[in-house]
């Protein structure tokens, strides 16, 4: 009796671990045009990394978790992201497919684990689109307010009847405009992105220089406030909580990897783009956050999604503040381009593999997965216009960390196959086999620092993912169809 009941379970477990042939991905992704260079990847990554979080998160994290020590949270997050970036760099140089961690884990560990990694990525990307649009809306409203233009209260934020807001109309419009832009083709998008990033970095440097003249040393004392029992503020507990929330800043290099199939010579170009983005972004994060908490006491940044422009206005630098707001509006818009682009490529990969309806894997005459693009665009419009900014930030970090853990552990399955049934890596994660484990543990510790609501919501998210996989994906996937032939 036990042997009979055990046989179906054994077959199911074997089925869940079926691995995809990398040549199948190479053939299906050949319709995508490889046009991205190193500078384009750094532009896309920096557009995301130095696009949203740098303009929106430092003030909120300082007020809610770290106090003046917010630069330490960025440094800790950078270490964790840097370790993961090394794993991403090696994996993307061997497996240059669309879909990033989803496709890689499918090849390395099997379809079930690939779906779990991909579902975590979808939480990261999908919610990131809404988060970025929400931050863009906050800056746009601040800029319009400085000109005496104010939207009706009901249209200025997520669904919060107690405070009179029902829908963030500007967030929804921003997502729609970016969806239209991306639908025109990747080459035009990358040119626009590079130009915006160059302007944005110049204005951030201007903020650092001007803001540094308003720093008051007393605002740094105490640099690490004492921990408040029962909260996630102060002490190293606060820094860990701040690090978990800040991790959203580093989804930029993850978004780069989603575009591997559209990259020229990805074996060399992708590692350069990943590491270049991380180094550049971290330097700007530390400088901006140090200046920001030095200008005003950290508590004054509570619930402020446009802290840099606010600090300049309240220190008398109105012209610079307005210039920063304009560039932030444009710069965060560029981040929206990068993350919506990555989101559509992930949905395309799900459709390509049959785990979601195959129509999502269709590529049009402009070499764009248009069905996937418009699905994620309209869903993100709903999410970004209804949910509040800080709620979205925490959820994005949770999805990011799960993906980082999978890719770091994936090195153990990848390295033995390099130079055999997979190409030799052009870049290798150093100190193997120790560093991949350190990277995975680091991300797991930061995940543990997330608030309980984020963990509960992620459990719910994965429950939905498992239902979709067992109800649809398991039977309709291309792996299943190939084995039935």
Residue map of PLM features:
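Hydrophobic alpha-helical segments of multi-pass membrane transport proteins
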Residues: 142, 203-207, 347, 396-425, ...
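C-terminal membrane-solvent junction of multi-pass transporters and transport-like membrane proteins
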Residues: 163-167, 359-370, 404-455, 475-484
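Helix-loop-helix junctions that connect adjacent transmembrane segments
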Residues: 25-32, 71, 148-171, 195-326
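Hydrophobic transmembrane alpha-helices that form the core helical bundles
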Residues: 60-63, 72-73, 82-175, 180, ...
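Loop-to-transmembrane helix boundary motifs in multi-pass membrane proteins
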Residues: 38, 166-172, 264-285, 302, ...
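Select transmembrane alpha-helical segments in multipass membrane proteins
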Residues: 35-45, 110-123, 170-174, 231-246, ...
